[in-house]
Amino acid sequence: MLQPLVDPSTGEAFQDLDKFLENKRVALYFTAGWCPMCTSFEPSLIAFRQAAQDSGKPVEILYVSSDRNKDASLQRAASLGMMAIPFGNQTAELKQRYKVWAGSESFEFGFGRRSGVPALVVLDKYSQELAFVAAEAQGLKALKSWDLDDDLGIWGT
């Protein structure tokens, strides 16, 4: 489901996914660089990621873009220090699977979404949804719904 990721600093596919995600907690971050709510949420998300790392509970957040084009997507993911899901079909599949997309994408994906951007889908070690972080609706307090102590959320264990 997640392979390959794109290293936004090079634009190339990142192939060694299992090793990269080993012993980390993983979330899909549905976002867009043009979205004011997303850009205001991101400093807290980055601080959360760093605090998790510092506490010995590393987190990997994967960028799922609602940006206007591939270049904007790669640039934004790189600025956040995140690996990216390849722009296009893979991001579309994830948006449909988890029912999360930007309002401007409703004509493409429909109106039956559970959330817009920003939002995170926390995955368990089997790539199944473990938790939903509804940042669009709840803002910064939404990060409290991510239980970093749940062993199901640690990949490669």
Set out the residue ranges of the language-model regions.
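A short beta-strand-turn-helix
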Residues: 2-26, 54
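Loop/turn elements at helix/coil->beta-strand transitions in domains of secreted/extracellular proteins
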Residues: 23-25, 57-60, 81-82
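Structural recognition of the beta-strand scaffold that forms the well-ordered cores
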Residues: 28-29, 61-63, 84-86
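Conserved redox-active cysteine motifs that mediate thiol-disulfide chemistry
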Residues: 30-47
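Conserved beta-strand elements of beta-rich interaction domains across eukaryotes
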Residues: 32-35, 66-69, 125-128, 137
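Structural microenvironment flanking redox-active thiols in thiol-disulfide oxidoreductases
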Residues: 42-78, 94
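Thioredoxin-like thiol-disulfide oxidoreductase module
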Residues: 66-117, 121-122, 126
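Thiol-/selenol-based redox modules, centered on thioredoxin-like
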Residues: 115-157
